[in-house]
Regions:
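Alpha-helical transmembrane segments within multi-pass membrane transporters and channels
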Residues: 28-67
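Glycine-rich helix-loop "coupling/hinge" segments at transmembrane-helix boundaries
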Residues: 10-11, 122, 179-198
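Helix-loop-helix "hairpin" substructures at the membrane interface of multi-pass membrane proteins
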Residues: 43, 106-183
Length: 198
């Protein structure tokens, strides 16, 4: 939408998974989702600042942030490359307990994934129809036209990357809670999958 290739996706996905896992292990499975999304916003903000304020090429900015996030993720995970969540209460275990004895028993993974996808789609449908959402879309199509319309393309780029990375981190958080573990390489190849899906 912004006509920007964000190569920090791999690191951001792992960042969301790591932050979500750490918060979930501390006993807050729902708060972990919000924390992971906020971590993604931070990652997107740094990437956007490198591109817009420091004049770094979008590809290089993504590579820089992705590389930096490796060290950040190790620090978040307490210096370990793996977090085991086998005895941790997650949104998936809570949903599993709630669905016990119902026809949906054993379908908690699909159900939570479906809920997450629906919520994201609903948010984007409404957000992209707002004034800010339309400005973000216009920035990707023609930044010169946006400038002539007295819209700040720097601001719209920052917001766009923050929103995109928050959803990337959300995906990482949900995957970590689903498989009950986080590995430092959990996000490897995510940017390839994202580009292929486009």
């Amino acid at each position: 939408m912004l006509n920007v290739c964000d190569l920090s996706t791999d690191g951001c996905f792992t960042f969301g998974a790591a932050v979500g896992a750490v918060v979930a292990v501390s006993g807050h499975p729902f708060l972990s989702i919000l924390a992971a999304m906020l971590a993604g916003v931070g990652s997107g903000f740094v990437t956007a600042i490198l591109q817009t304020k420091l004049g770094v090429d979008s590809l290089l900015a993504g590579i820089i942030v992705n590389t930096a996030l490796y060290s950040v993720n190790i620090a978040v995970m307490g210096g370990s490359s793996l977090i085991n969540m086998n005895r941790t209460t997650t949104v998936f275990t809570m949903m599993k307990d709630a669905l016990a004895g119902t026809p949906l028993k054993g379908r908690e993974d699909i159900l939570i994934a479906a809920i997450a996808v629906i919520l994201v789609i609903v948010f984007l449908v409404f957000f992209l129809k707002t004034r800010l959402g339309l400005a973000i879309r216009a920035t990707g199509n023609n930044s010169d036209m946006v400038k002539s319309s007295s819209i700040n393309p720097v601001f719209t780029t920052i917001i766009g990357l923050c929103v995109a990375n928050s959803f990337t981190a959300l995906s990482g958080c949900l995957l970590s809670q689903s498989q009950k573990s986080v590995d430092i390489n959990i996000g490897q190849g995510m940017v390839t999958i994202a580009l292929a899906s486009l």
